[in-house]
Each structure stands twice: as C-alpha cells, then as structure tokens.
Amino acid sequence: MIYAMSDIHGCIGELQKNMEQVDLGGDNRIVFCGDYIDYGDSSYYVLKYLWDLQKKYGTEKVVVLKGNHEQMFLDWIEDYRNIYSDGTEDCMTFNDWICTDFDYGANTISTFLSKQQMDFLNQIARTCSMETISREAVQMIISNYEKLIWWIQQMPLYFETKSQIFVHAGVDEEAGEYWMWGASDNTLLGKFPATKGKFYKTIIAGHVGTCSRDLAADRSYHDVYYDGESHYYIDGSVYKGGKLLLLAYDEEKGEYYQVENGRMAFVNPAGI
C-alpha cells in the first residue's frame, strides 16, 4: 500500500488523526506531497512530526516532498541569511512570505520562536521595517533550528514509481516521458491551473482546492478529485474548514481509495 497526504498547512491534529489510519508495516509506505506550513497554528510541529517519522522509518518508507510554501519560507531565510553573511543590504529581499504570515497572525513564525523571542519581534514591529523584523527573525530561526532548515532544503520535488508521479503541483505534461529533464521548480511546486486528461503515468498531486472551477467546480467538494484518466488531486483546503485527506493506493489491485474514519472508499471519477 502507498499512502499519500498533501497540504497539511500547520494542522497537526488532523495529521495525527490521519496517521492513526496508516499502516507502515511490511512494504507499505507514505508520500507527503508538500505544503506543511502556513495558515494553521502548528507549522513547526507538523515539520517536526514528519522529520521524526522519517528518521524512525527511513526515507524509502516515508517520503517527504517539498511544496511551494516550504520553498517560499526557504527563500525568505536565504535572502536574509545573505544579508548577514555579506554584510550588506543590497539584495532582493523576499518579504512575500513573512507579510502573508503576519496577515494570518504570524501563525507560522511564532511556532519557531520562544515567547520571549516573539515578544521582542512584536515590540520592534511598532517602529521597525519588515526588513528589520525579518533579519532578526531569520537569525533566531537559524540559531534554533539549523538542522531542521537543512532537512527542508533537502526535500525532493517529486517521487516516481513505475506507474506514478507524486508531486506537489504537477509536471510539464507536454514533454511526455521526458518531463523530468526540463521540469522547472516553478512547475513542480506551483503549476496552475490543474491539468486533466491522459498522461503516460498517473499524477498524484495537491496544491489546489478540489472544489475549484478547474476541477469539481463545486464549493462544497473537498474530496480527492479523480479526472477519470491520469490525475488524482488531494484537496488542499483543510485550513479553510475542509478536511485533511488520506489517499491509499493498493499496489496489488491497482486501485485508489480515500481513507476516512477507518473506512476505505474507492475513488471514482468525479461526478460519478
């Protein structure tokens, strides 16, 4: 059995609940398809949970792919790390990530910092620029979690089996079987809109809400979306009041199931 989850977005309780339904015995394994941070209130704890899980079972049984939110977080860290190492502020600063986080009540950054460190940032935020806040925050996070940051940096962008490609957003399907040779990070991490139709391998991805007009076109739809051909999309809107989905692939039967509350429901093409 191959399990898959995506777009956990800081929701540790939902992750732990889903993992109670996962059996990693025998040849079973699980693939996490990115976006573990932001929006929810437990981003660090989600990352730590996955890191510990992978250390326990190994990288072959627990595959942790990178999502666009992890990459934005890393871009922000790297930009301000360069400011310190170069001794100059003449560089392009990546403020999109931290501005978005502050819009959500600093839900992510606060989980990486102690209360004392967060109080300090809130204090200087009254008079200092976002650049100053970022410089201080990055130094604190690197000091606290250098090994964890390295682990996030090493996350692969896709996982491939003989018949499947697990990825956060998608691949360049126009390239056919040569998709990996010209695959850009932007496509793998941020492809939009979601692709439907026939491909030579099955694509399992997250990144999007399956309720979107490009997929189910139904605001109430928060299940795995199967286009009836080559694409399974795991809904990415748990933080909006949806549910964290668990997909399971039976390698012997070649069938996909949505696992919920201990029950496995066969994934039919959307609309059937």
Task: State each model region's role.
Residues 1-272:
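Feature recognizes metal-dependent phosphohydrolase scaffolds
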